[in-house]
């Protein structure tokens, strides 16, 4: 029987690089992934016409993250909310059992506004849009430990609620003019997948 091999020695540069990579992997940890901390409440807002890929993909990633973290408790608690208890998705599937838009959101939390079909997002007079926009104005995500995350054209709802004032933002490649109309004092960054402000 041979002795177990010693782990390879790492140079100071390799060690620093490994720490940086480990730190990058834990980027969301700044708000709830530390051991013993509160889980992050993640509110996916799903009005009519929501693109399933825009919320199901991120929700699955967070669910998977919960399974990979220590078993004590999840880092993310997922909530699916909307003005109505059921919402017709982008592909015609009805998403039911949605919770109402909460009256308050306490930190740590994320509010995720997802993209929608072009027909759903273009109606300025839409009742559901007005309810979501009024709700966003009340709960003011993006402040006091409640992060605002917009996916694709979900940025248009945040812009309509006035949440992008003097912010650096992006949206779906087909919507920069609409974003500029709704948030004229925001800095819209075109042709970007991410804009962090």
Name what the model sees in each region:
Residues 1-148, 157-160, 190:
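Extended, subdomain-level signal for the structured scaffold at the beginning of enzyme domains
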Residues 151-155, 173:
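Alpha-helix N-cap/helix-start capping motif
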Residues 156-157, 178:
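Phosphate- and divalent-cation-binding pockets in alpha/beta enzyme and binding domains
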Residues 165-193:
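A conserved active-site-flanking secondary-structure segment within enzyme catalytic domains
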Residues 196-197:
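Conserved anion/nucleotide-ligand pocket segment
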């Amino acid at each position: 029987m041979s002795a177990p091999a010693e782990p390879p020695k790492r140079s100071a540069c390799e060690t620093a690089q490994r720490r940086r990579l480990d730190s990058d992997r834990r980027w969301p940890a700044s708000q709830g992934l530390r051991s013993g901390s509160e889980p992050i409440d993640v509110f996916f807002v799903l009005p009519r016409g929501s693109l399933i890929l825009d919320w199901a993909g991120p929700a699955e990633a967070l669910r998977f993250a919960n399974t990979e973290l220590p078993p004590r408790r999840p880092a993310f608690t997922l909530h699916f909310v909307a003005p109505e208890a059921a919402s017709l998705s982008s592909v015609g599937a009805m998403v039911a059992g949605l919770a109402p838009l909460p009256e308050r959101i306490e930190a740590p939390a994320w509010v995720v506004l997802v993209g929608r079909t072009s027909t759903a997002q273009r109606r300025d007079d839409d009742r559901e849009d007005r309810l979501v926009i009024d709700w966003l104005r009340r709960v003011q995500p993006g402040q006091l430990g409640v992060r605002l995350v917009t996916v694709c054209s979900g940025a248009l709802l945040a812009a309509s609620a006035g949440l992008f004032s003097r912010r650096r933002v992006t949206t779906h490649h087909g919507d920069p003019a609409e974003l500029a109309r709704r948030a004229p004092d925001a800095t819209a960054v075109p042709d970007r997948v991410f804009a962090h402000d």
